[in-house]
Amino acid sequence: MSRLKKLYTEEIRKTLQEKFGYSNTMQIPVLKKIVISMGLAEAAKDKNLFQAHLDELSMISGQKPLVTKARNSIAGFKLREGQGIGAKVTLRGQRMYDFMDRFCHIVSPRIRDFRGFSSKGDGRGCYSLGLDDQQIFPEVDLDRVKRTQGMNITWVTTAQTDVECTTLLELMGLRFKKAQ
């Protein structure tokens, strides 16, 4: 069992139940999955660059990414139907907790001028953020990076509100900006 999963089962669940007054333990929010996605439309023209970004996403997540393909052709964007335009990885279970632990304690402190993430969610218990650079991850070999590439990370929880979601993620180690 990972350190973060153990922390969740032993401490975070109790804290959330006390704070929000849940009458049933099944109401306590749980982290369901983490989705990491990259839009690689510019890299789609260069197969070597596209493959390099796929390899980086694979190293960051620990599993093979799914290539997202264009649904239809758009001549103005020089896009063909079925052409790879992005990649995504869905993390669940042990890998999800390992990624969350690494992201909170190793990756986010490496972000330049980091003062915390925005605490605004989607209103339904999910939280998303965008990163500008993949080089903040220690798994990425800086000598092999051909071009900086951003990514989106989405945490999907069973929380009903943004407050519950951000409280859960904050207790797990994600740092948010303080309201002023």
Curated annotation (Swiss-Prot):
Transmembrane segments: none annotated. This is one of the proteins that bind and probably mediate the attachment of the 5S RNA into the large ribosomal subunit, where it forms part of the central protuberance. In the 70S ribosome it contacts protein S13 of the 30S subunit (bridge B1b), connecting the 2 subunits; this bridge is implicated in subunit movement. Contacts the P site tRNA; the 5S rRNA and some of its associated proteins might help stabilize positioning of ribosome-bound tRNAs. This is Large ribosomal subunit protein uL5. Part of the 50S ribosomal subunit; part of the 5S rRNA/L5/L18/L25 subcomplex. Contacts the 5S rRNA and the P site tRNA. Forms a bridge to the 30S subunit in the 70S ribosome. One of its GO terms (cellular component) is ribonucleoprotein complex. NCBIfam families: PRK00010.1 (NF000585). SUPFAM superfamilies: RL5-like. GO terms for molecular function: rRNA binding; structural constituent of ribosome; tRNA binding. It comes from the Bacteria. HAMAP family: Ribosomal_uL5_B (MF_01333_B). The gene is rplE. Keywords: Ribonucleoprotein, Ribosomal protein, RNA-binding, rRNA-binding, tRNA-binding. GO terms for biological process: translation. Belongs to the universal ribosomal protein uL5 family. It holds the Pfam family Ribosomal_L5_C.
